Structures are given as C-alpha cells and as structure tokens.
Amino acid sequence: MSVTTRLRLYAADLRYPPDLQVHTAASGRIASLSARYLEIERSDGFRGTGEVRANITYLSHLPEEAVDPAILDLCRRLRWDAEPEEILAACRRHESQVPHVATAAVENALVEGLARRNGVSVAEYLGGAWHPAVETNQCLFWSPPETFERLAVRFLGERFRQIKVRIAVGSFEIDLARLARLRELAGAEISIAVDANGAWSADDAVARLRALERFNLSYVEQPTIPGDWTAFNKALGSTSLPLMVDEGLADEADVDTLCRIGSVALAHLKIVKLGGPPAVVQAMRRFTDAGVGVMIGQMNEGAMATALTAQCAMALQPRYAELYGCYGLLDDVTSGVTYANGRIVLPPGPGLGVTFDAGRCRAIWDEHVGHA
C-alpha cells in the first residue's frame, strides 16, 4: 500500500519580557525567537513535530531568510514513502550537504514521531529513562546592573543551583564586578560559570582567565575564537579553570580535535548545532569514551525544542544540562513545560508529551509528497 505524507512548516515569533531578553557577545540583543515547526503526518498514522530556531545566524552562519528554503530543499530530497527509520537514516546522510538547522528540523520531527508511534518518551526511544523533571542551570544575560541583581535574586529564590553569566559584552572590569556581586549573593555552594562566546584572543584569554580564578567558577565557556584550536589550547594550558567548547564544535573534525584534547576540556552539545538528536547521541558516546565532560544544552528556543533537549539529557545523563531556553516566554505556541525548584518539569506521554497549537502560528508551506 502506498503511503502519502503531508508536510507543514509553521512559524511563530516568541517573545521574552525585556528583563529576560537574550544578549550575548556573539548575538547582540535578540528581541524575539523566530521559531519554525515542521509537522509530518503520514497516511499510515505516523505523526511527529519538531521545532528549530531560524534567527541563529551567529551560530549557524545561515541567514534567517535562508532557513525555510533549506528545510524545504531537504524535504524534497527524501523518499517519504519509506519507513520513518529509513527516512531518518537518509536525513543523516545529507548532514554534510545541507545546513544543520534544516536536518535538525526534519530529524527532530522524525524522532518525536518515532517515539510517539512506539508509545514511549523520546528519552526512552534514545535508550534512556523518562523523568518528570531535570535539573538545569539558569542564565544571566548582559543587562543593566539593577536588572542583573534583580534576576540573580529571583533565580536563587527559585532554587536554581547553577548560574551562568554572559560576559565579554562590556568591559572586563564590569564583568568582574558582576561576578563579585553574584558570588556575594549566592554564597559558596552555588555553581557559577561564565560564557565569553568566543570574544577573546589567546593573549586576552590567558590574562582574563587568571583574573577569573578567584571566583571558583565551574567552567568558562568558549573563551577563544571558535575554530582557533591553537588559541584554545594556549588558554587551556594557562589556567586551572575548566574550559568548555561550544561554538567551536561545528563539525565532526572539531569533535575529533576535542576528543584528542581529552578530559582537561568540556564539550557543549546542541541539537541544532550538530544536526539532530542522533548526532548528539553519537557525539556524547565519543566524548564519554575520550573522558570529555559534556553539557547538553540548546539555543534559547521554544518549549517544544526545549523539551526535546531535556529528553536528550534524560537519556544521556551529561555532567551539565542547560535547559532554560523557554523560561519566561510570553507567547509560546507549545504548552506543557514549566520550571520549579531549579528544574525543568515535563509532561508525561509518548513522544515529547507537549501540546502544540498550530492555529497560533503562520503557515509557511503545506505539501503532500510521495517520494523524491
């Protein structure tokens, strides 16, 4: 019996209140998240939905306006009359030919649908166990001092035990003052980390890491320019602080390089950066074998993408989990995800268990397909 597939791509702009807007050294201020939702519905009953964020040019190097055509191009390359597992495998074979944000959109929807079809959570589909809640860090983006302090007090009051501070936006002296105030508010028991988003040269990193050592940081994320492994190694050899690679993990060659560096470094894995959940699982296995500690995290994204990342964290049990992406969003089109006691709380149910309201989105395209 032939199978027909309906593919629908939706868009929604998700907004934070002003105090929670994204502002990093790499991104600048982001007023809203430009979300995309791919919905796959087959005549055999298979159904899955996946979310990615389009306005991440500073990470993906793909203009926002090119994301929709990239997703459509990949969809038209695939044989949709094949079994979903075969489509997922074919999608992975295209990862070197199309932008990872496009493969992530398709793979996220397929993985969610496969878990739903099998009557299990995504965490179980990926080989782990589902949990109702997962501990997460929280993030203090660049903001005026009064906002920084107000949010620090709020996050600590909400029992977040891990706080990450975005630095390298203003002067380093301001960064030091903010960290001193946060440590004063948090005390010695709270984990504090910083993220420079690749803003420093090797020499600047060496000097500034030395100045940061007094704050007893859990790690410093992406201190040097992504892709400059010579600079990263110089920084790594200059400090006792753990250093984490994020933007610098752009492809398989970067994974190889960090595996060779080994346990003295940390890795930050993101679905949209690597191309989909299977790539995250594969990279996690490689880093575990190499002794590299891992954080599984995300871009700031809506609740559907955040829930998927959280289920990956459930399955893979990384050292750190960064799952604050949908915290505080005012108009998310996906419901079911909440935060309590420093944890992200997820609904039960097959797949992701969340509820997606396509009626609140803009329709980008809607196609019935057979095969390429």
Question: Which ranges hold each PLM region?
Answer:
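A cross-domain feature marking catalytic cores of carbohydrate-active enzymes
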Residues: V52, Q138-L140, V165-I167, V194-G198, ...
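Short beta-strand elements
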Residues: R36-R42, S335-V337
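N-terminal amphipathic alpha-helix/helix-capping segment at the start of soluble metabolic enzymes
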Residues: S2-Y10, R116, V120-P132, I344
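Short, Gly/Pro- and small/polar-rich lid/capping loops
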Residues: M1-R36
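Conserved, mostly hydrophobic/aromatic
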Residues: L38, G45, V106, G119, ...
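Metal- or metallocofactor-binding catalytic centers and their adjacent structured scaffolds
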Residues: V3-A11, E41-R117
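Shared catalytic-loop signature of beta/alpha-barrel
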Residues: N216, G227-P242, L249-P350
